Amino acid sequence: MKKLLSLLIALAATALSFQAQAQDAKAGEKKAAMCIGCHGITGYQASFPEVYKVPMIAGQGSKYIISALTAYRKGDRKHPTMRAIAASLTDQDMADLAAFYEQETKGDAADTKTAAAPSPAVAELLKKGNCASCHGENFSKPIDPSYPKLAGQYADYLFQALKAYQTDHNPQVGRNNAIMMGIAKPFTHAELKLVTGYLATLPTELKTVPQSRFR
């Protein structure tokens, strides 16, 4: 029995190692042509279904990127364009794209020493949402790699994302995540804007890296 258990553990470790090695950043770079029209333009603003700057994803964790794309594909995140794109991707495509975007800012650690302290009102709201317990004290080091880095992300995107967790019965806007829905719903829109405005000012590892469609 002990030998069987040891074998199963070894096989599981091998499988996890293989999955990690299966992410190919070079392949992801070639597959990113469909992404750079929005995510490769600094400050690019979406106009449908809502108006906001598309998120910076260079430097975001690969497991989070995979999680987000999977949620779009399943319909847990509602966005017509992103769902269509995610539906066209295989699991391998997602892994490769995530690896490419994660490594684009490797070595560019956020300088947390320059982070401004939140105002008393914002500090109270962050405490109310218990935000740091998952996203990390500096909001750049989430406790789980499938959670996003928030520091320095565009305020209007963060606001739209949090507002989406409050949205029900809308075929084009909304996010289905029980934990985040429970956290976001007690906040007013004004409170969400205070929180996201502060998060956007923090030192960040996230960037938009301009890229050409022609490679």
PLM regions and their residue ranges:
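Bacterial N-terminal signal peptides that target proteins for export
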Residues: 1-8
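Sequence/structural segment immediately N-terminal to covalent heme-attachment motifs in c-type
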Residues: 23-45, 114-139, 154, 211-212
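Residue-level hotspots at or immediately adjacent to binding/recognition sites across diverse folds
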Residues: 41, 85, 137, 176-179, ...
